[in-house]
């Protein structure tokens, strides 16, 4: 499938019932988010809001709201075919000459596609049919969405930010959210390790104080959009990779006000510069973690020109608690990651980033184990091989027969094959996502690896505790009786897959230190006689009978080293996955995203009329 532009892709989706046009007037402020969120959770179509209240441009959301549409955008019929894309990337990351005629023939399709990597430069392009400049630049005319009740301002989300460092020939494409603060200014929120920020840093070193050119394209063709979120090798441009995906060269045109090349078919392009000395407070915004992030200082992007197609479509999205569109992209791109990892670690059978773990904070790896300690090598490899995994806090390694996408199987492997103290690896003071408010300081926190593989004799010889003689069964009734005098415990779960070795507790937390004190009392009451290996403590807003809820709480509310209580005498680990109170942490704790009940009721009344799903 070869889509020349976004409109071509939308036609394709509409023919297959994967696009819904909404003619009813809908407000970009909050209403579009509520409708898009419901549609995505129902695995519904992409949405084209043709009459946004107060604006002339239609708004496209939920474009990549299912893994299947991501695959279509990459020119594939099935999600499983995305592993072919991963094999391409693995080869391009570490190319090897063919080792014979047979391998040459096998790799001919890849070699042929390389012809599509160079860009095709146009002198005129659809994205420059209309031009705003000077006083005509007015971002207030674009239907930029406001997503959540406590968001500070409207937020541009799907723009492909195009930069070039002074020492690089190739451009960088990245997707960074942008807070609108004026008719011609937005705040560019990019993390220090991202390509755009690195280009700016190099520019500031070579051209101190000079404006840094930037262009931002909205509504490019699907291959170019997805190329910007795929882990392409540093030596490969996103435009070149888009050409590989599409099967035809990426068409670009030079920006009107700078030398940066933008997608020729983009719907809207913002051009301008970043003044290295101009900053502003960004946020708070409801983010993909399900919380509002902290306010941070970031550079301001001044827009000097806006170019667009005739009757442009504004491409947008929202981010919130999984599942959201970034989480769906994560599920699809997971298939791309597997061959890349297998190129370096052939012993990896499967690799999964659960969306409930914010798509990157937890990884499940299944392994063809070959020697003692193999699982720990793989943990360290995951953390160090690709920068996409530098923020992964939890890595669980299981044997190859375990289905990494099935929580009962993963939990069974943990309780049956782990000695919690021996088979957990803690690493402190490591890079952590700045949005992770559970880390002790911004950008720095701990990681945990859990070796849930069957142990070899050499591994069994290094044991912290022998639980083989703990034959006492632990029933749910007995556990509840044991905790009957604990008024703070609201619910108890003993999952069937856990084989009496893992318990989840729901508590009403009101005071600092309450969770840790409760965990210690639970340990004392069990008195070393129970078969328990793991205790997980959650707040009363978590459904402890739903692994999706539990994993979300663990990955958003824990710093593994700080919030793990290790009981040496009983070979037991307790995880405190509760919200931390001000006296427990120094950082500002995240506030969960809450929907406005009045807005929900309004969309309820419209829902049947919209006829989306």
UniProtKB/Swiss-Prot annotation:
Pathway: Cofactor biosynthesis; ubiquinone biosynthesis. Keywords: Cell membrane, Decarboxylase, Lyase, Membrane, Ubiquinone biosynthesis. Its cofactor is a divalent metal cation. Gene3D superfamilies: Single helix bin, UbiD C-terminal domain-like. It is an enzyme of class 4 (lyase). It is a peripheral membrane protein. GO terms for biological process: ubiquinone biosynthetic process. Its main location: membrane. Residues 460-584 are annotated as: Unknown insert. It is found in: Cell membrane. Coiled coil: none annotated. Pfam families: UbiD, UbiD_C, UbiD_N. Its EC number is 4.1.1.-. GO terms for molecular function: 3-octaprenyl-4-hydroxybenzoate carboxy-lyase activity. GO terms for cellular component: cytoplasm; cytosol; plasma membrane. Homohexamer. Belongs to the UbiD family. NCBIfam families: PRK10922.1, UbiD family decarboxylase. Catalyzes the decarboxylation of 3-octaprenyl-4-hydroxy benzoate to 2-octaprenylphenol. This is 3-octaprenyl-4-hydroxybenzoate carboxy-lyase.
């Amino acid at each position: 499938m070869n889509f020349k532009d976004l409109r071509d892709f939308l036609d394709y989706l509409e023919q297959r019932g994967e696009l819904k046009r909404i003619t009813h007037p809908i407000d970009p402020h909050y209403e579009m988010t509520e409708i898009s969120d419901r549609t995505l959770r129902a695995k519904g179509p992409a949405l084209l809001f043709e009459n946004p209240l107060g604006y002339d441009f239609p708004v496209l959301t939920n474009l990549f709201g299912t893994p299947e549409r991501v695959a279509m955008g990459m020119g594939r019929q099935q999600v499983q075919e995305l592993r072919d894309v991963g094999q391409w990337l693995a080869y391009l990351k570490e190319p090897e000459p063919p080792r014979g005629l047979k391998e040459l023939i096998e790799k001919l399709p890849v070699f042929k596609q390389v012809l599509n990597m160079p860009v095709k430069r146009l002198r005129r392009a659809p994205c420059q049919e209309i031009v705003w400049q000077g006083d005509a630049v007015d971002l207030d005319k674009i239907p930029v969405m406001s997503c959540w009740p406590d968001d500070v301002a409207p937020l541009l989300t799907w723009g492909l930010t195009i930069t070039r460092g002074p020492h690089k020939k190739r451009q960088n494409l990245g997707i960074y959210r942008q807070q609108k603060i004026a008719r011609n200014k937005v705040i560019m929120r990019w993390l220090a390790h991202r390509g755009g920020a690195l280009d700016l840093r190099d520019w500031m070193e070579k051209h101190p104080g000079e404006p840094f050119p930037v262009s931002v394209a909205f509504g490019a063709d699907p291959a170019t959009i997805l190329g910007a979120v795929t882990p392409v090798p540093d030596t490969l441009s996103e435009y070149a990779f888009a050409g590989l995906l599409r099967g035809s060269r990426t068409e670009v045109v030079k920006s009107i006000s700078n030398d940066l090349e933008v997608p020729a078919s983009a719907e809207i392009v913002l051009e301008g510069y970043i003044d290295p000395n101009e900053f502003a407070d960004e946020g708070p915004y409801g983010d993909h973690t399900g919380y509002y992030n902290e306010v941070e200082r970031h550079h301001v992007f001044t827009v000097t020109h806006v170019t667009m197609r005739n009757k442009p479509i504004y491409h947008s999205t929202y981010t919130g608690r999984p599942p959201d569109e970034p989480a769906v992209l994560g599920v699809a791109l997971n298939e791309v990651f597997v061959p890349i990892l297998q190129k370096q670690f052939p012993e990896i059978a499967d690799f999964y980033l659960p969306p409930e773990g914010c798509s990157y904070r937890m990884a499940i790896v299944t392994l063809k184990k070959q020697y003692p300690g193999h699982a720990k090598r793989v943990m360290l490899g995951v953390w160090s091989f690709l920068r996409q995994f530098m923020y992964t806090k939890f890595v669980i390694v299981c044997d190859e027969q375990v289905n990494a996408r099935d929580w009962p199987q993963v939990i069974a492997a943990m309780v049956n094959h782990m000695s919690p103290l021996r088979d957990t690896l803690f690493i402190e003071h490591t890079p952590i996502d700045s949005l992770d408010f559970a880390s002790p300081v911004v950008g720095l926190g701990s990681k945990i690896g859990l070796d849930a593989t069957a142990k070899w004799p050499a591994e069994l010889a290094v044991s912290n505790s022998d639980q083989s003689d703990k034959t006492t069964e632990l029933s749910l009734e007995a556990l509840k009786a044991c905790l009957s005098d604990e008024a703070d415990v609201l619910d108890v779960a003993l999952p069937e897959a856990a084989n009496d070795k893992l318990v989840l507790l729901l508590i009403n937390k009101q005071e600092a230190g309450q969770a840790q004190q409760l965990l210690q009392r639970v340990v004392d009451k069990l008195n070393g006689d129970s078969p328990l290996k793991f205790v997980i403590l959650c707040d009363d807003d978590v459904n402890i009978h739903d692994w999706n809820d539990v994993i979300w709480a663990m990955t958003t509310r824990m710093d593994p080293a700080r919030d793990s209580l290790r009981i040496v005498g009983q070979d037991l680990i307790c995880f405190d996955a509760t919200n931390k109170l001000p006296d427990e942490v120094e950082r500002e704790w995240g506030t969960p995203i809450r929907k406005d009940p009045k807005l929900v009721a309004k969309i309820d009344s419209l829902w049947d009329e919209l006829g989306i799903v």
